Amino acid sequence: MKKIIMLMGCLLCLVACEKENLTYENIDEGEDVDVSKLPSKKFTFTVKGEFESATFMSNATTFRAPVYLSGDGNAMTDLWVFDYMNDRCVQSIHQVSTDESWGKPQMSLAYGTHHVYFVASRGDSPTLDDEGHMIVWGIPKDTFWKDYSVEVVSTSNGNRAVTLDRVATKLKISVNDEVPSNLGEIAVTPEKWYYGLDYKTGDAVSAQKKERTVTVPESYYGTTGRLVANFFGISGSDEWTTNIAVEARGTDASVLGKASITGAPFKRNRATEYSGNLFASGGGFDVSISDDWDNPVTGEC
């Protein structure tokens, strides 16, 4: 009887060990598996943002996670987390800034190798495309991203701090001459502007030619050198260029001034500023590459 009990004990041990070693990686291809039933470990990710760029940014700022995720002085509104194993999305989370656990998403990760992709943004009207693994915004604004790799075993530390990198770029239009009292808006039309992000690669997607406008408050009428309009986009790590038409329009929609910008360069975590006289004839714009991402502005779009 003792021998039988010992044998049964060994068999139970073998079964338990086999279950412990079962991971998503060794499931047969095409097999339909409920990943939530695999051995797993609970992870809590504390999300923050690192705004330092080795080339352009001199000072680092961080998200005040988990309560308040902020980029350029404004709160992020959306946080997405996508968990991939064997190049397949097995689970995802979408948080908004009003969620109780905002900035500290939790996931149970099955044992094995994971790529966990994070996206934090305050862009307007986001649309998620699961098949294309991308997010496209109606109006992109400050946005951060990270591809975070983790190997999950039974002894893994389940508390992880994840630092995201800025993938947004910015066009700044600075008007140096006096603002007329009937100015209604500043409009820009880039020939190419990226509105989306491939959350697996971090590449900019969804290039569009679309007009963007910023409404000018009456408090700027009669002022000189104060009018600054910001226009955000998504950018990859490589520099790219586009041509831009700029118009200043009156409150009656009349054109008060305009300019053409050729070959404007853009790159993630960088502001490209054009400054000059928009209302004076023959004024033109000067270009500068700026690390002053967070300066006060008249308006943004």
Regions found by a protein language model. Name each.
Residues 1-4, 18-19:
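Positively charged n-region of N-terminal signal peptides that target proteins for export
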Residues 6-9:
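Sec-dependent N-terminal signal peptides
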Residues 13-16:
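C-terminal motif of bacterial Sec signal peptides marking the signal peptidase cleavage site
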Residues 18-78, 126-190, 287:
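Primarily secretory-pathway and cell-envelope proteins
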Residues 43, 116, 160, 171, ...:
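Hydrophobic residues positioned within well-ordered beta-strands of beta-sheet architectures
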Residues 65-130, 182-270, 295-301:
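Tryptophan-paired
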Residues 142-145, 266-279:
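Low-complexity, Pro/Ser/Thr- and charge-rich linker/hinge segments at domain boundaries
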Residues 277-301:
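Acidic, serine/threonine- and proline-rich intrinsically disordered appendage/tail regions
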